[in-house]
Every structure is written in C-alpha cells, then in structure tokens.
Amino acid sequence: MKKIIFVFIAFIFSAFAQTNLQDTASTGNSRSANSGFAEEEFRRGVQSYYRGSFNESILEFEKALSYLPGEPLVLDWLGKAYYRAGIEGAALQQWNYAKEAGYGGLLLQNRIEIVSDRRVTDYDYGFTQRFTESGSYPNVNGNNLIYSQPVSSLSNHDGSIWVVSYGTNELLQFDVNGTVVRRNRGPINGFDRPMDVIRLKNGNLAVSESAGDRISILSENGSFIKYFGARGRGQGQLVGPQYLAEDDFGNIYATDFGNARVVVFDAEGNGLLHFGEKTEGFDGFKSPTGIAVCGGRIFVADSVKGGIYEFDKAGNFLGVLVNDGTFSRPESLKQWGSDYLLLTDRNKVYAVELSSGAVFENAITGKGKSLITSAVSDRNGNIIVTDFKANEIYVMSKMTELVGGFFVQFERVISDNFPEVIVEVRVENRKRQPVVGLKQQNFLITEGKKPVEDFVLLGEANNNDFADIAILIDRSLSMKKYEEQLSGAVRELAASMDGKGQVSIISAGKVPVTEFSGNPSQLSDFSAKALKNSYTENPALDLAVRLSANGLVNAEKKRGIIYLSAGDSENTFTQYALSDLTAYLNNNAISFSTVLLSQASPSEEISYITRNTNGTSYYIYRPEGLGTVIKDIVDIPSGLYQFRYTSSFATEYGRKYLPVEIETYLLNRSGRDETGYFAPLQ
C-alpha cells in the first residue's frame, strides 16, 4: 500500500514539474543538476532579451547551452539575441543548428531564408520588378453600391488610401482591408465628376472636377474648404481638368483636356500661366493627361500622341522623355521614388526611368475590359490600381512577396501584471519594408494553439507623431573650424522636436562619450564648446554609433540617429563591420541620417549606413533648413503593433516557459511567429 501511494505521489510531482529543457548528458543526478542550471540561465536570458539587453542575453543563453549542449529551444533564442544585436551571421549559424536538430519546421526555415536573403541582396526595393494582383476592394456589398468607376487614388501615411469615385461623385477612404472608413462628397452642391486627387505640401487635398471645370481644396480629412478655377479659355480657366501635380513652391498644375494645355495656379488658386501650345520644337498637345513634377522638371503624357514630354517651370519645352507612339493611351503619371515615373496605359502599368526614358512593364490586368486610369505606390510598397472600365480597385504586390509572405517577429513580451500580458509585434515584408495600417482583425494570437482571451490591439507605432533622437557629433580634427555651425545645427534640430520625446548627444572622440540626455528644450542654448570629449585624429565612430543605438533600443518606437560631421573622417570603423552596424540599426528600427556642415562628401562608410537604414543626407545650409529633419524621421513607416490579452496558463510560480503564437493576415498574404515568456517569480 505504501509503495502504491509513493508511486502515485511521484506521478503527480512529475506531471507538474518544470520540463522545459531536456538534458542530453548522462542520466542521474548530473541530469537533474544540468537541467536546473540551464533552466535558470534560460529564464534570465529570455528576460534580458525582452529588456533589450541583447549582449547580456547572449551570455546567459551560452551558459544555458554549456549545461545542455545542443538544446534546440536555447539555440533558437540565442539566434534571436544575435539577430537583434546585429550579428546576423552568428544568428543564422545558431538557427541552422536548431534546424538540423529537427526544431522549428517551416517557420524557422522561412526565417533563415528571409534573413539570408536580406544579407546578400540590395536593400533597394526595386522599381522594375513585376507586380501581380494580391487582392481587390469590391465595389458592392450585397445590394449596396460602394463605388463606381474608380478613376484615381492617393496613399496615406497610415496605410489607408483615398479613391476618387467618378461614377458616384465621391472621395472615399479605404483602410488596408478595403473597408470604407470615410466618404466625402465635396461642397454643398457636391463634386461634379471628380477626376484626380493629390496631397498638397500643407497637408490639404486637391481634387480636380472634370465636369465642374474647377479644383476643390479639402482638409487632410476630406472636409471641403474652397474651390477655384472656372470654365473658359483664359488665364486660370479650365475645360475638363484631369490630372494634378504640385511643385516645391506650392504651385498646382492641372492638365486641361478641353483646351489641350497645362494650367498653373499658385497656392491660393490664382492663375499664373498655361503652356502646351505649339512652339518651336514642339507641335502642341492633342490630349494631355497625366502630369508629374520632379524637382524643377515637369513631365506630361499625351493620350493621343502616346509619349511623355518635358518642360521647365516656366512652361518652356525641354524635350521628349518617351517618344511618340510608345504608349497606346497613357493616363495617370506619378512620381515613384526619386528616379522613376509610374504610368498607366490601358491595361498595363509601366515604370519610366527619369534619367533615360527607359520603359519597364510592371503589371498587367489581363486582356478583358480594362482601362487603368491611375497607379500609385501605397505605404506598404504595393501598387494601388484603379480600373475605370472594369470597375475595380486592385492591390498589386511583388510576386516574390506573395510567395514568401510577411516576416512577423515578437519583439517584446511584458508579463509584469500576469495574467495580463502585453506583446509587441513587428510586421515587415521580405525586404524589411514595414507593413502599416493593420487592424485587430488582421491578427490572431494563440497560447499553445488556443485563441487567447480579452485580445485587444492597443496601438500602432506608425501613428506616433514624435521620436527619440540621438545626435552623434564627429570630434575629428577637421570639426574645430565648424563649432559655430555645429552649435546652430544642434539648436535647430532640438527646437524642431517641439519639446516632444527625448534627445541625447554623443560625441565620437577617441572613446565615445554621452554628453547629454534629456528634453530637447534644454538644448536651446547649446554650444559646441561645452562638449567634454577632445578632438582626435581617429574618432571611434563605429563605437559611437553602437553607443547611440544602445540608448535607443528601449526608447520611443520611432527613433533615429543624426550624425553631424564635416564629411571627411577616415579610418573610423575598426571595431565593428559596416554590415553588423547596419544590421543592428535595422533590426531595432533605428534610422541613421547625416547632416553635413561642409560641402564635402560624406565618407563611403557613412553613405552606406545612411543609404541602408532609411536615412537621408542633408546639407546644413539647404534652402529649407534643418527644420524638417525630425519630421522626416517621424514619417518613416513603422510596422510595430502592441496587443494586450489575458493568459490562461498556469505559471508554476514563474518558472514555466509559456508559449505564445501570432498569425497575421492581409488579403492573400500571411505570416506567423512563435515565442515564449516567463511570468514573474512568486
């Protein structure tokens, strides 16, 4: 009887004991000791990882493996820690070890493929690749009409799009799932056959009305403000305006179909000039359609002549970008990146290279009834296509993206108030481009494959309107003569933060030093002479970049480094490889921008980091100043989402590893990730 009771008690104990890690060493007491030590180090490693202490977590996972060599779960986590620390080669090595042990399945294999691909291919997203349909927004819901004859669209920073519905005289806003979230009909008497919509530099919208012979101005939310223009052939008059564009000075350009010309208005709506009539070297427009302004160059398509023509801001003809007859019936023409135009032609979408006029076919909708009247790039790297005749709105994605799906990563799990759990999840495509605008319906969180309770989407970092900034100052000898410019640049950057977020100043001397950390308002009287770090012939810039990034890992979800330099530093990257530094910044969503205090070119190393981390290079005396640098950082898309749910797991007093999974869906694309965490010790 005593023996039976003993066996029963032993069974109960074993059923509830911690069995997260299995010892591969010899049996007996050594097995129990090794498992216990490994589990404790593993728990510490997971907690360090979620605190953003990646180097510390690497050491703790290595200790766990010293007790349990080859444990796949620990190998997976060690790979994650190396990845976030920017050491992607070591991360891939650990993940491959885990994969060879039969761990992770397709999920781990996909992660290895994506990270490997990112390391060996260019970060450039590629403007000449093929796109194919990944989804569409229906024009009816049961017996209810949603839109009719979509004619143009405009992307928004939150992932949504505006669509002009020509047939219903409306401007509609769709979220990423194709749900209408806002519907506008213009002035009191309504739109009169709206044709195109653009966003002006002040944030307002401009809508051309082809039957109303006018241009309406709306707020950023679509509320009507005013309109200008009138029917006629005189200055500032229109007959059937079609497509719109705006230049750097706020002037608005409209292709005037009825008068076969382009009409230019100032920012207030006053007519300035018109052009496109027959002149020397140019025989005049026959049917001007799409228009795009790129710097000081104006490009106009003609649907009858089938070419693209270039003018200056005064309306002088400069030449032919794409020869007559190249296109069958070109319509919309929009700038795409800095080097291409996006053009629609019947059932096709083309990319046109600005430097050469080379034409690349990007997408085709088929051979049926089709007339594509606009194609624009959205916030997620798709092309939104409006098909006037087919009455469809298509979402076109790169073919490689449809095959590979999303790259989804758990970045942090906060379980301090267990059973309430908060998780932060990042969603990207295979080329590291964030996926923004997702809603709660696009996610499914499970624990042990069972849906969690009280699941709520708390927010999306992409909607944040401020950022934390690290200002990195070059202390090379050449910077001595730029102290006045440096002081002014720091003050201007800090002032443009409007007292929001935190700013730190790191000086890149022989040894990097954190000179300041606090509210940007405290830098209103900053002077370069107050910096403690001495000038040096060889500043340790790589260590300074690493130090700057370390301070931003746990900062606001939007964050960036701004490097101030005269541009001629050499031999400054000796401790860390450029690829590892760039990976560290990218894997923690930290951008790197450069402000040059002289007209010298930045070093190749700095250019590489700036180019590959969503950064931008600025000259201190550029006409618009440095006031928009912070805004540019805030405007960088972020695919980070935060959720809250209630866990149903037992924690074994905080010693049990609790699994959690997430799946993300959008139209015909999906992605998933798995992780785990520990509740607080009791």
Predicted regions: what is each one?
Residues 142-158, 188-201, 234-248, 280-295, ...:
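Beta-rich, blade/repeat-based domains predominating
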Residues 160-163, 204-207, 251-254, 297-300, ...:
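Conserved beta-propeller blade signature
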Residues 274, 484-487, 495, 499, ...:
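Exposed acidic/Ser/Thr-rich ligand/metal-binding surfaces
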Residues 367-409:
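Blade-level signature of beta-propeller repeat domains, shared across WD40, Kelch, NHL, RCC1
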Residues 404-470, 477-482:
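Acidic, polar low-complexity linker/tail segments
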Residues 401-404, 414-421, 611, 621-682:
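C-terminal "exit" segments of structured domains
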